[in-house]
Amino acid sequence: MTILHITTPELWAAGVRLGRYEHPSLSREGFIHCSTHEQLEATLLRHFAGQDRLIALEIDPALLSSALRWEASHGEPFPHIYGPLNLDAVSGTFDPRQPR
């Protein structure tokens, strides 16, 4: 099972240049927000309404070098990455607004 992280192409490109991805939420909240495939649509509506330029990162939890914790939010467990996202854990990217 993969988990997803929604970001902008610019933030993802910066992470690729850096060699690891660090979303601004990591310094603000201490973790990177993620979702399951089933949570994607609600996450887009709740947090990304009106934003057109988005990219979804597909992440293999088994390859994470940072801790992954499942924590309750909005009445259900969401995956949170507690540290930088190592690039080799990202198995692919896609436009989250396009049907798959």
Model regions and ranges:
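Conserved, structured core segments of small domains
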Residues: 1-100
